[in-house]
């Protein structure tokens, strides 16, 4: 499977952070995002070809994170702390506008059959 583009990673990363309370450790994002994109463990552990011994997937997520910082959706490392990715107020607003979570209460008891109205 081919890796998604950096641009394709940005919104799922923003929503992943939002859905986990707005602040996460960087290392906790790589695997869940990889699963969103259908990457296998093997694909997520392919190393960069530059002899730095860093997974290519982690590097791609970090670049997407940098773009979110540039958009002012995430705090930079000086503001949030090294290894912590934290949404800004603008990032929270953006995530809320994109979020598909629905806060709907469903009744516990739903009749199994419904009667159709009779036509006279």
Outline where the language-model segments fall.
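Short, amphipathic alpha-helical interaction segments positioned at domain boundaries
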Residues: 89-120
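Short, hydrophobic-biased segments on the C-terminal half of alpha helices
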Residues: 65-66
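Basic nucleic-acid-binding interfaces
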Residues: 31
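Minor-groove-contacting beta-hairpin "wing" of winged helix-turn-helix DNA-binding domains
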Residues: 81-88
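Positively charged, polyanion-binding regions of nucleic-acid-associated proteins
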Residues: 2-28
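A short, conserved structural fragment
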Residues: 69-79
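Conserved, well-folded catalytic cores of nucleic-acid-processing
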Residues: 36-40, 71, 101
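Short, positively charged loop/turn segments that connect secondary-structure elements
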Residues: 2-4, 34-62
